[in-house]
Amino acid sequence: MGSLSNYSPVMEDVQAIRKAQKADGTATVMAIGTAHPPHIFPQDTYADFYFRATNSEHKVELKKKFDRICKKTMIGKRYFNYDEEFLKKYPNITSFDEPSLNDRQDICVPGVPALGAEAAVKAIAEWGRPKSEITHLVFCTSCGVDMPSADFQCAKLLGLRTNVNKYCVYMQGCYAGGTVMRYAKDLAENNRGARVLVVCAELTIIGLRGPNESHLDNAIGNSLFGDGAAALIVGSDPIIGVERPMFEIVCAKQTVIPNSEDVIHLHMREAGLMFYMSKDSPETISNNVEACLVDVFKSVGMTPPEDWNSLFWIPHPGGRAILDQVEARLKLRPEKFGATRTVLWDCGNMVSACVLYILDEMRRKSVADGLATYGEGLEWGVLLGFGPGMTVETILLHSLPPV
């Protein structure tokens, strides 16, 4: 019997192996699951809670300003993994800049994979196949950096097989929901039979802090961000009658907007994650988004549509002003961002998990309304992630009919 050391495969053998490794079809989204922590906070009374919980009620004028900011966000409520009683145990967290990273880490390190696992369980149940058939796990979060990392902890909580291929995407921010879909596409299409579990989970306590007159960026962040997790099952060549594909991930591209690094940036300090956001962020995004859209269409040999209203839209809701300016720049009808504005109203900005929530909202409403596709009855659409860098993720989607 010959040994492998004496065997020299010819190029045709390698090409045949490579061809056999690849899937035949495009990556598809087959299932979606979401999860919230238990505590719900109405936005119209959030200023009262926030200033009380941070022992800042004496800052009367700052509270009035923060309340006005909250009421302009177009957010109705948000979910958090903490309540006032919980925060009272951590005066260092509710201060503005006292050392608190150890306590924040102790909350986030177990909390992030646990919340992500809740969303994953729902996605796996909807998918309808055994969890042992999951071949890859992509886990994304902007908090709780640790080793073993959150992907390991989530896989352990779910009881995934020990040889699942894991990937952890840390500290990418609000564009990362698009990033993980790009990764999932490459994994599914380059590994025949792969089923990729994608999980995004975010907890805002990594950056929660008391108000400060000299750092209003902090007030904006505290008015926008909420906790949540979302999960997808992504795979190519769906099994007919067993798996139900909803969206084909046709193309996924990332673009860094030149000279925009200071528009949105965050920094981990002993006092937790510090948030900085320029007033120029809506204009920076809206001035560059059309070029990203044109690029993704041309990269697959398609002519960009003359009217952007012919597509369905899943933009990340970085905030009301960003949505308003992108909508105006692309001359979109108000209803085109309907799914995004619904999620923003119901949950706030959940960082990387947000666009996956919007995907879920769109497909559910499309089915409820009896439309021809999961994408509001339209075939083609785009998912957009915006975040630090400034970085834009542009995902071209093809929507399929409900089964």
Curated annotation (Swiss-Prot):
Keyword annotations for this protein, in alphabetical order, are: Acyltransferase, Flavonoid biosynthesis, Transferase
Look up keyword Cytoplasm and say if it applies. Answer: no
EC number(s) given by UniProt:
2.3.1.-
Query: What pathway does this protein act in?
Result: Secondary metabolite biosynthesis; flavonoid biosynthesis
**CDD domains the UniProt entry points to:** CHS_like
State the InterPro entries in the record: Chalcone/stilbene_synt_C (IPR012328), Chalcone/stilbene_synt_N (IPR001099), Polyketide_synthase_type-III (IPR011141), Thiolase-like (IPR016039)
What are the transmembrane regions?
A: none
UniProt GO molecular function: acyltransferase activity, transferring groups other than amino-acyl groups
* Protein known as: Octaketide synthase 2
Q: Look up and give the organism this protein is from.
A: Aloe arborescens (Kidachi aloe)
Q: List the taxonomic lineage.
A: Eukaryota, Viridiplantae, Streptophyta, Embryophyta, Tracheophyta
Give the gene name: PKS4
